[in-house]
């Protein structure tokens, strides 16, 4: 991004920020909680950008003064050296801020702010794959809890020996998709299963899909396309067990997507949950098809969301987690404990690097 384009975008962002501040002072906005929250969130997103831009402008003034001082010091070796050091320090900070601001102005995924449906499916490996799916679920639950996100299971198919054949978690919070989108793909584990009597290492897999939540306006469903049936659900015990048909089996006939929801206590709640899951699945399917139409370079990027991509291997023997997209290793135990900050942070940095590279190529063209 050239200097004039960067300046124009920063000035536009600052103008938007000032406008949002004026709106927050409007009594009509204060009386509308939904609108107020949306404006406050956008203001909070822009504030660091505006503050950095203000610092950049101050720096440019200091650079000008430093260059003038350097001219005045010609002939005084000691003063000239001090002035050169000062100018070099200012130039370094200016370069750092310019890069930071350029990254902040890169095109944003409009889905980044959304909550998600996190689907984990056992893959190859039989019972051990189901147990591994359960381990991944705990990893994401711990990570989400550390960030203050709300995590709830909304659909599950438990395995006989522990874990899950399939599990869908609702993860609600600020900018959930912006981080968890990097988890989509095949997660492979290499370890000795608890059921292995010979001590042999087995390789099992689980697939993670990260689906941004979709509302009823964004994904409209035709009732004629839906086939809904009910079944008995275990419930919470006592008289409700296996006596009331609260479970909902939902089939979307055009896509063949089926959703079975049993987590809620009433049939109406399970029906709403099933429709929520279906909308998220249909939106994700539409986005995957759109991505498939793009170039292979785009699909290879970090965070592309390809659920068939083998993204990570968890090796218990060596206490190592390898992210194949990054070509980097991380300590296994902290990762399984939900300490994903370094790993996801590295994915975000790589995505930004790829975007900057693409932007640079566009400028050259």
Swiss-Prot record:
Q: Which domain of life is it from?
A: Bacteria
Among SMART domains, the record links this protein to: PCRF
Q: Which cysteines are joined by disulfide bonds?
A: none
Which PROSITE patterns does the protein's record reference? RF_PROK_I
Question: What family does the Swiss-Prot or TrEMBL record give for this protein?
Answer: Belongs to the prokaryotic/mitochondrial release factor family.
Just give the chief location class. Answer: cytoplasm
Q: Where is this region: Disordered?
A: 289-316
Instruction: Give the gene name.
Output: prfA
Please provide, alphabetically and separated by semicolons, the GO molecular function terms listed in this UniProt record.
translation release factor activity, codon specific
Its GO CC terms are: cytoplasm
Q: How is it modified after translation?
A: Methylated by PrmC. Methylation increases the termination efficiency of RF1.
According to the UniProt record, list the residues that bear N5-methylglutamine.
239
Q: InterPro entries in the record, alphabetically? A: PCRF, Pep_chain_release_fac_I, Pep_chain_release_fac_I_sf, Prokaryotic/Mito_RF, RF-1
Query: What role does it play?
Result: Peptide chain release factor 1 directs the termination of translation in response to the peptide chain termination codons UAG and UAA.
This protein is called Peptide chain release factor 1
| Keyword Membrane tagged | no
| Localization of this protein | Cytoplasm
